[in-house]
Every structure is written in C-alpha cells, then in structure tokens.
C-alpha cells in the first residue's frame, strides 16, 4: 500500500455506531434464538412424551433449514434488499416461534422448525454481512472481538 505524501494526514476510517449497534443486536438475537430455541423445544417435546428419535429428527430440521437458507440468502438479499430481507426473516421467525407455543400437533412442528431456523439463518448471514460492511477494515478485528 502506498504511503500518503508527507504532511498529508492519513484517511480516518469512521465507525458508523448506530448501524454497528443494530447489527450486533441482530446477531445477539440470533444467538439467543439458537442457544435457547434448540434445547427448549427439545425439552418441551420430551415433556409431551415424544420419543427421543422423533425429537432428534425434528431437531435435524434446523440443520437442513440452515443449509438451504444459507444457500439462498445472498440472492434474496440482492433481489429484495438487505433490510427488507431481514425484516421478513424477523417476521417469519416471530410467527413460527409463536406457532411452537400455540400448535400442539407434533407433526406441524417440522415445518415450523424449518421456517424458524431458516429465518434465523438468514438473520445470521445478513447480520454478519452488515457488521463487515459497517466496520472499517482496519478496525474489523476490534469490532468482531
């Protein structure tokens, strides 16, 4: 990288704090949803008498949904915008989370799990993108920890 001429101040890379705080809040929400969602739903299913095999099969839907959602996130965000895609993912995650509470039919928890974890994966990918876009390269290590 070339050095600026002597006497010329080096460019200052500013961090846009409101955007960075929002992006970190988003990734924090993703961490809470994954960290609490997987074990809590398994405990609820166990309390309802669901076999451990079916609980494991239902939990596997999270991984499948995550792989599928990660594959389509960039294209979706490109077509509809990052903010709109994130808002849709938040809406889908919230509706499916409520579905776990109100829907007692175990078999309907499979599509709920796919929607919930697919939406959470979209939020994860776009939050990471947002953090990387907001933090200047020279400070990215500081921001990401």
Q: Can you describe what each PLM-predicted range is?
A:
Residues 69-81:
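Helix-to-loop junctions at the C-terminal end of transmembrane segments
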Residues 14-63:
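Helix-loop boundary and gating motifs at the non-cytosolic
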Residues 84-99:
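Structural signature of the two symmetry-related core transmembrane helices
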Residues 41, 122-135:
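Intracellular juxtamembrane helix-capping segments at the cytosolic ends
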Residues 34, 115-127:
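Core transmembrane helices of Major Facilitator Superfamily
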Residues 23, 105-113:
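Short hydrophobic/alpha-helical segments at membrane-entry points of transmembrane helices
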Residues 81, 102-107:
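Helix-breaking motifs and short loop linkers at transmembrane-helix boundaries and internal kinks
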């Amino acid at each position: 990288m070339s050095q600026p001429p002597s006497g010329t101040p080096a460019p200052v890379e500013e961090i846009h704090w409101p955007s960075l705080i929002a992006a970190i809040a988003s990734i924090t929400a993703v961490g809470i949803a994954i960290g609490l969602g997987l074990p809590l739903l398994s405990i609820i299913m166990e309390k309802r008498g669901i076999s451990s095999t079916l609980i494991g099969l239902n939990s596997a839907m999270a991984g499948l949904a995550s792989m599928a959602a990660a594959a389509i996130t960039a294209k979706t965000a490109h077509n509809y915008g990052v903010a709109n895609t994130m808002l849709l993912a938040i809406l889908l995650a919230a509706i499916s989370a409520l579905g776990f509470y109100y829907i007692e039919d175990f078999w309907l928890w499979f599509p709920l799990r796919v929607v919930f974890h697919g939406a959470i994966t979209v939020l994860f990918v776009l939050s990471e993108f947002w953090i990387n876009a907001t933090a200047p390269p020279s400070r990215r290590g500081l921001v990401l920890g």
